């Protein structure tokens, strides 16, 4: 009698363990890779690189994070945060939402400093009073995704006036735009607190480091600069 009871007990334990293991494996396959969406402008895309698909910051971030992650580059040259910009991140939102990412990294604002006599005929800074509300709406939209992603908002990488080869017109334009970028960073920091999202500072660690930027440009990083961005983002995501 006792022997039969032991057999029944052991059988039940085996079934429970088997079921637990099976469910665990199913959960793992359903979850799959951790999806990371990198949202931004030409700096996210990898402008000035010979091969953005290999050396952009999202591509280098993929290498740092490894096979458990799937990093997708949603960078668009000239992209703005404000809705009235052309092009604007709002036109890309459907693609981002279709991915339903687990992690979102947003680095926008550089092109929003254009306007009022800088960057040719572009009009962005004329709408600076709409920046905060548009950014808030963007975060709200992403937070509403089914995946409930962990959102990281970046202080955009700096404009480095010490970069070799800048002509006088470029220096003049960047001198006007650089303080505007700091205003945007202040908005970013306020939103981080308000929305309880994560903050990544790409500005302070890279400022006054011309060796990280493309010559005659001063805004777009070189290969080493994109590597620096990837490492800064990696440090935050992997915490």
What are these regions (language model features)?
Residues 1-39, 43-55, 59-70, 98-100, ...:
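N-terminal secretory targeting modules
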Residues 32-37, 43-136, 182, 220:
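Conserved SGNH/GDSL esterase-like catalytic core that processes O-acyl groups on lipids
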Residues 49, 116, 156-239:
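Catalytic His-Asp segment of secreted/periplasmic serine-dependent ester chemistry enzymes
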Residues 72-74, 152, 198-200:
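General small-molecule cofactor/ligand-binding pocket signal
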Residues 107, 152-155:
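Conserved beta-strand segments of the P-loop GTPase G domain that flank and frequently precede/overlap
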Residues 145-150:
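A short helix->loop->beta-strand "cap" motif at the edges of active sites that frequently abuts
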């Amino acid at each position: 009698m006792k022997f039969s009871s032991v057999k029944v007990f052991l059988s039940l334990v085996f079934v429970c363990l088997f079921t637990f293991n099976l469910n665990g494996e199913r959960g793992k396959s359903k979850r799959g890779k951790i999806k990371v969406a990198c949202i931004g402008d030409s700096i996210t895309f990898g402008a000035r690189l010979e091969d953005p698909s290999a050396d952009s910051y999202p591509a280098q971030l993929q290498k740092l994070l490894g096979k458990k992650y799937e990093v997708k580059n949603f960078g668009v040259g000239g992209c703005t945060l404000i809705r009235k910009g052309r092009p604007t991140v709002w036109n890309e939102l459907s693609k981002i939402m279709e991915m339903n990412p687990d992690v979102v990294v947003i680095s926008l604002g550089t092109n929003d400093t254009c306007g009022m006599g800088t960057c040719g005929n572009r009009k962005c800074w004329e709408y600076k009073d709409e920046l905060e509300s548009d950014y808030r709406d963007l975060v709200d939209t992403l937070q509403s995704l089914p995946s409930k992603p962990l959102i990281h908002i970046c202080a955009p990488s700096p404009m480095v006036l010490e970069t070799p080869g800048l002509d006088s017109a470029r220096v003049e334009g960047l001198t006007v735009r650089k303080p505007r970028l700091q205003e945007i960073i202040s908005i970013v920091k306020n939103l981080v607190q308000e929305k309880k999202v994560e903050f990544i500072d790409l500005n302070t660690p890279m400022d006054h480091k011309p060796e990280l930027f493309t010559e005659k440009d001063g805004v777009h990083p070189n290969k080493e600069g994109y590597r620096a961005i990837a490492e800064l983002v990696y440090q935050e995501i992997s915490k």
